[in-house]
Regions:
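Positively charged n-region of N-terminal signal peptides that target proteins for export
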Residues: 1-7
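Sec-dependent N-terminal signal peptides of Gram-positive bacterial secreted proteins and lipoproteins
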Residues: 7-27
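Short, solvent-exposed loop/turn elements at domain surfaces
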Residues: 21, 93-97, 429-433, 647-649
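N-terminal non-catalytic accessory region
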Residues: 29-252, 259-312, 428, 438, ...
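Alpha/beta-hydrolase fold catalytic core
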Residues: 213-227, 349-437, 465
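The feature captures the conserved acid-bearing segment of alpha/beta-hydrolase catalytic domains
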Residues: 300-313, 407-414, 419
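Alpha/beta-hydrolase-fold enzymes
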Residues: 303-389
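Beta-rich interaction/scaffold domains
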Residues: 547-647, 651-660
Length: 666
């Protein structure tokens, strides 16, 4: 059941932001029937914000909700470094449904109802699908028309996400609590410390920023008001100052954490921010993301070839390494007329918006400021209906904070606080993980880290769409030192052009890149204060690499083998040990080089993993020939059928069929 739950949650993560309800239904049913779906070792769901990591955490952290005694005051290990507060990204703060006593509620299977992103009662999924969808599904299939299926999809979506629904005031309907840490990392339980380093992989550099006594983790709920969270952040800052004896703190925002910084700076703009030493924004949501703007505006890429042929194979390939299931689903969807598919897609989007997004201020905080007016006008009932007056006032307040952000940051900077930004760029939303965001139409024009657009994370970079370059006429008028080597980004238009670092081709999951973690440590510890410092090691424009498995697994596995070999040399072949030592040393040297390049990191990992396999660690390289052949066959069948029917269903070729017209709004 654990593997089933993992795949169901992975599906639900996707369906939250993807507008395909039929895809959602198929994924859920397939995941329930096949516990191994998507569990291939080639899956890219890992590192920060990962569903797989979160499920592993829940399975291994039995005392995630354990109480810890309040720590005594202490002095930081490094008196020259201000304490650092991490404001994490989406899914990195764990919330739970609480019972009447404030304890985590459990479902009928005895599982805690908790999560970093979605809180889903997986025990109810089979019953919901059977009781709500099954009947209309069969009837609609027989009649080749929407016989209540879209209504059933809407009801299913609202039931699945009901735990995190918000009311018309913008407040959570259920009793949701968030695990908080009123003490430094050094005072955490071992399970919580392990969780922190899984989410924020700073273990290798923690001494550089003053040690674990100097590092704090400010968690906050997703279903919330960012202005209220910002007020809690201020109290947290005062607590950290008292515990450490320091006058100021460093703030590190990650992804969604940027919205909390935005709210904080607006809420306390009249104080001149006396508590802030410096701010580090790491792929931070400082001006929303077009992913959210598109979803609210229902601005999806529904071009026939993309949506009805390319999209699902791309998503399934990301999940388990092969596009086979995506091609099969494409073919299976042909059993319905196109009008039915469009009706249930619309219903799914309606359900997600009505349950999760429209009444939740934190989701509104992820809309770019220049798209806010269009969104609020689309849902004009929120500003016109008195029942929504509190919600409207709340989201208007944050919109003003967003409009004032640059002025507030300039004010902060004038008080002597540096503001640094670290960004990934030159990707559209189809790149690497979470490629279901490619369904958003802005994917065709964005330059991003595959989640957040570069003008948001960098505070104003000018860009060409991913894969293209700025015009020669534009570049000729700009300072060349701020133009990226690939010609796609101009950093001179950023709010702080000498305090922003760009990693070309870097995905939003920056925890996989050891160089970015090292850069954060240099910035927090005052070793780097601008792009003019250490440009040979940390240039303003760098590449990307994924060293996560090397730093997280390979070194530890090798150390264990070396220790066993030292104790009993007969356990391993001497030549295999020699090769493992050689690749170990090569990896150490490689990681000292902070100029990023992706292919060399991949080659090093493959060599390291093979050396470990030779000494019995890990699995043998799998024979993929059958999977590859099956993928080719299914792709051929899918493309052949699409060539005949296009985006239409099989029955759409029958002119005598009954058609129920449905307005398409997804």
């Amino acid at each position: 059941m654990k593997k089933t739950t993992k795949r169901v949650l992975a599906f639900l993560l996707a369906s939250t932001f993807v507008f395909s309800a039929m895809t959602a239904g198929v994924f859920a049913i397939a995941s329930y029937l096949n516990p191994n779906l998507g569990s291939s070792s080639t899956s890219t769901y890992m590192s920060v914000n990962s569903v797989d990591d979160f499920i592993d955490l829940i399975k291994t952290s039995g005392n995630a909700f354990a109480n810890i005694d309040e720590p005594e005051k202490h002095n930081a290990a490094n008196e020259d470094v201000a304490p650092t507060i991490i404001i994490p990204g989406i899914s990195q703060s764990v919330s739970y449904l609480a019972d009447e006593n404030g304890n985590p509620a459990v479902n009928s299977n005895g599982e805690e109802l908790s999560g970093g992103l979605l809180i889903i009662d997986s025990s109810t999924l089979p019953g919901i699908l059977a009781g709500t969808v099954a009947g209309p599904l069969v009837t609609s299939l027989i009649m080749q028309a929407d016989m209540g299926l879209s209504d059933a999809v809407y009801e299913t979506v609202t039931q699945v996400f009901s735990i995190q629904a918000s009311d018309k005031d913008g407040k959570a309907k259920e009793n949701l609590k968030t695990i908080t840490y009123e003490y430094p990392i050094s005072q955490m339980s071992q399970d919580d410390r392990d969780y922190f380093y899984r989410m924020i992989p700073m273990k290798s550099v923690v001494d550089e920023i003053g040690g674990e006594d100097n590092l704090y983790f400010f968690t906050f709920p997703l279903i919330s008001d960012p202005m209220i969270t910002a007020a809690k952040l201020d109290k947290y800052i005062q607590m950290v100052k008292e515990q450490t004896g320091k006058d100021k703190v460093n703030i590190v925002t990650v992804s969604l954490g940027g919205t909390i910084l935005t709210a904080y700076l607006e809420l306390y703009k009249n104080t001149n921010y006396p508590d802030i030493n410096k701010v580090l924004n790491v792929v931070s949501c400082l001006d929303g993301t077009d992913v959210m703007g598109d979803f609210y505006m229902r601005n999806f890429n529904i071009e026939d070839e993309f949506f009805f042929q390319e999209f699902l194979p791309m998503v399934m390939k990301e999940m388990n390494g092969y596009a086979t299931l995506g091609h099969l689903i494409n073919v299976a969807l042909k059993i319905f007329p196109r009008s039915v598919i469009e009706a249930i897609l619309t219903a799914a989007v309606d359900g997600i918006l009505d349950t999760l997004m429209l009444n939740c201020p934190q989701f509104w905080a992820m809309i770019p400021k220049d798209r806010y007016d269009d969104v609020i006008n689309k849902y004009s009932f929120i500003k016109n209906d008195p029942e929504y007056s509190r919600l409207y006032a709340t989201i208007e307040k944050f919109q003003q904070a967003r409009l004032n952000l640059k002025d507030n940051l300039i004010k902060l900077n004038k008080q002597g606080a540096l503001v640094h930004n670290v960004c990934g760029y030159n990707l559209d939303y189809s790149a690497q993980d979470y490629c279901f965001f490619a369904a958003m139409k802005s994917s065709l024009t964005t330059n991003s880290d595959a989640i957040i657009d570069i003008d948001s994370t960098s505070l104003g970079a000018t860009y060409a769409k991913a894969g293209e370059v700025l015009s020669e006429e534009y570049i000729a008028t700009r300072d060349p030192k701020y133009i990226s080597p690939d010609g796609s980004v101009d950093a001179s238009t950023c709010l702080f052009p000498d305090n922003v670092w760009f990693f070309q081709g870097q995905h939003h999951e920056v925890g996989r890149n050891d160089v970015i973690i090292k850069l954060i440590a240099k910035l927090a510890s005052n070793q780097i204060n601008s792009t003019a410092d250490m440009p040979d090691k940390f240039p303003q424009f760098n590449g990307n690499r994924n060293t996560r498995n090397i730093t997280r697994w390979c070194f530890d596995d090798a150390d264990r083998v070396f220790a066993e070999y030292a104790e009993d040399p007969t356990l391993y072949n001497a030549e295999d040990i020699e090769e493992l030592r050689a690749v170990y040393e090569e990896a150490e040297v490689y990681l000292e080089n902070t100029i990023c390049e992706p292919t060399s990191a991949k080659a090093l990992l493959e060599r390291f993993e093979y050396a470990l396999y030779r000494v019995g660690v890990g699995d043998a390289p799998a024979d993929t020939s059958t999977d590859e052949a099956l993928e080719i066959i299914c792709k051929f069948v899918d493309e052949t059928i699409y060539g005949v029917f296009g985006a239409d269903g099989f029955s759409d070729l029958n002119d005598s069929k009954v058609v129920i017209d449905v307005p398409v709004t997804f």
